[in-house]
């Protein structure tokens, strides 16, 4: 079996820490470099439910997309939720490694996985990484549909292909408009509106769209895409877990490590229920 340090080196080759945003907190959080690794679990969030799942699985390494401590802390006491995660992992000899914004911009990265889940053909990054001469790394992806769909059909595909959440898919725009090109960005995306406009796509699928930015963007019809599709943050990033697991599986096979790599299907989206408004004449619209 490989040592943790060997597996981490392989993960760092996939998602180098130096490509993370300056504010981010990526890399190995807990773990003994010389410990042996057999089972690896991928998940979006390093929360207690996932730590407990890792224990039940007998995992030696937990790889998550979101950081455990994005901001500084003065305690890892087990009386705190994050401290309890740390204690659970250490007591059970489970290492924790985080790949966040360095996985967002990777080639392939979070948005490639999202595009793949929706059967979209990736054309280029939405926001190219200027440090990549090949022009393949960057934030978000500009994609083409193999065959045109209506906004309604694209939303239905997203609802079917992405993991189920209480939110589902919210839509702004004409549900019958035709979509041939779409920009996607896993995770929060309303900071990318200027890049979406510049890309000239028909639709933008992302997460965490706020009222005012979305309203202003949609109102500027001359420069905005036909539709906005807003999915749950967790759901747009979960496909990366499958991508990362497949990449590590390939590395394991190449090195003869015989790792057992798993993807958590535990839903850690914070929203647990949705109550629909009263029906209107337009099922995808809102009352006057």
Across the structure, where does each feature detected by a protein language model lie?
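Hydrophobic structural segments
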Residues: 1-288
